[in-house]
């Protein structure tokens, strides 16, 4: 299934596209700098790009952790990025988010992994009519996403993506099963792989999550070789000082060489026709 986002199409057999940006809006300056650099990199690589940043991280480990600037200031900043840099925007929404207000600004709505089984929420987000990126819960088998997608499609909105972001494996740990990407393709939706949250160690630092950043390229390459429509990566100029998800964010300065590799892998896989639409 092909899906129009801004001025490009995404799909399982289309060239790899990128969703990237900082985990949370820390400041207007940082967001503009990161978005500008990512636009420059993706233009050089001729890679479709959607900028991602959150105005409210509602599921932080601690109530003392930074959540973001809030919806009013956050949407103002995201709208500036969109208009100034002319890039499409994706941001996550929650059960208490005024959805139409967000949908009026961004190009894609994203549902958090923890909320993928909340039927009313999924239907409400899909009913906005915008493209939706549904993140698969860490607790969910990949074949269960067919039912989640069906809930969204029931609203009449077929512009649905599904995003793999790892599986809970014991306490404070996630693993990635690349077979899941082939299974998720059976939904007929564009499949996204979240290479940075997949290396997260949820709650690993007690009051915050840890992460194994060094494995981001390993999983990103593996997922691209397995066959995906897009790659999702949170990035920051100085991940060790990021206000959210720093341990699993990929350094902005290292984005271009990694994306160059992923682009070449994607070409090999798709030109050879390796993307099975069924696991049968």
UniProtKB/Swiss-Prot annotation:
<dbReference type="Pfam" id="PF00793">
    <property type="entry name" value="DAHP_synth_1"/>
</dbReference>
<dbReference type="InterPro" id="IPR006269">
    <property type="entry name" value="KDO8P_synthase"/>
</dbReference>
<dbReference type="InterPro" id="IPR006218">
    <property type="entry name" value="DAHP1/KDSA"/>
</dbReference>
<dbReference type="GO" id="GO:0008676">
    <property type="term" value="F:3-deoxy-8-phosphooctulonate synthase activity"/>
</dbReference>
<comment type="similarity">
    <text>Belongs to the KdsA family.</text>
</comment>
<comment type="pathway">
    <text>Bacterial outer membrane biogenesis; lipopolysaccharide biosynthesis.</text>
</comment>
<dbReference type="GO" id="GO:0005737">
    <property type="term" value="C:cytoplasm"/>
</dbReference>
<comment type="pathway">
    <text>Carbohydrate biosynthesis; 3-deoxy-D-manno-octulosonate biosynthesis; 3-deoxy-D-manno-octulosonate from D-ribulose 5-phosphate: step 2/3.</text>
</comment>
<keyword id="KW-0963">Cytoplasm</keyword>
<dbReference type="InterPro" id="IPR013785">
    <property type="entry name" value="Aldolase_TIM"/>
</dbReference>
<protein>
    <recommendedName>
        <fullName>2-dehydro-3-deoxyphosphooctonate aldolase</fullName>
        <ecNumber>2.5.1.55</ecNumber>
    </recommendedName>
</protein>
<keyword id="KW-0448">Lipopolysaccharide biosynthesis</keyword>
<dbReference type="GO" id="GO:0019294">
    <property type="term" value="P:keto-3-deoxy-D-manno-octulosonic acid biosynthetic process"/>
</dbReference>
<keyword id="KW-0808">Transferase</keyword>
